[in-house]
Regions:
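Active-site phosphate-binding/coordination module
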Residues: 1-64
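A short acidic, often aromatic-flanked loop/helix-cap motif at beta-alpha or helix-coil junctions
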Residues: 21-26, 122-125, 180-181
Length: 181
């Protein structure tokens, strides 16, 4: 949440981040962390299943580590590895077609986790209870808002996208397709 707060020029706003794992507010002009959930991760499970995907689909050569384990308990499985060159990442899967082709298989293999097509080369994983729809609705209920009073703005509503649970949950949203304008 602190990263987002700083990216927004320290604008005094409540922030729900990392699919609901983090929450912050601003009190008297100061950033205040409200919640910062952490989950235990079965690293062996992720490494084993990532290797199965690599071998089956030909992603056995990669730079750095196969899987990145974040402090909060989120996991990133980058098909090009954790240390892939930026230029390789940018041309690897710009339309996400390579990852969409194996998305259902990855979801099946990693049951018990929410799977997102993340970044430019990766799949991101959170525990099932962490997704943007549930995070926004939890925040809304605690602050006296109904779903009908919420308008979500995002850019990744397709299946596997970080905002997909918003669409699937039936929340009103605006889909940003070109954030440069």
């Amino acid at each position: 949440a602190l990263r987002i707060y700083n990216q927004m020029g320290q604008y005094p706003i409540d922030i729900v981040a990392n699919y609901g794992m983090q929450e912050s507010t601003v009190v008297n002009g100061e950033f205040v962390e409200v919640r910062n959930d952490r989950c235990q991760v079965d690293k062996e499970f992720f490494l084993k299943n990532a290797q199965l995907i690599r071998e089956k689909h030909g992603y056995t050569e990669y730079a750095g580590e196969s899987v990145e384990f974040h402090d909060a308990g989120m996991v990133t499985f980058g098909l090009l590895g954790t240390e892939a060159k930026r230029e390789d990442k940018l041309v690897f899967d710009p339309d996400r077609a390579k990852r969409r082709a194996i998305y259902k298989e990855v979801c099946e293999l990693f049951k018990g986790y929410t799977v997102y097509i993340g970044g430019s080369t990766s799949f991101d994983f959170t525990e099932k209870q962490y997704n943007k729809y549930d995070a926004v609705m939890d925040y809304a209920h605690r602050n006296g808002f109904t779903r009908d009073e919420i308008l979500y703005i995002g850019d990744d509503f397709s299946d596997g996208g970080g905002d997909s649970h918003i669409r699937l949950g039936g929340m009103d949203y605006i889909h940003i397709t070109d954030f440069t304008r």
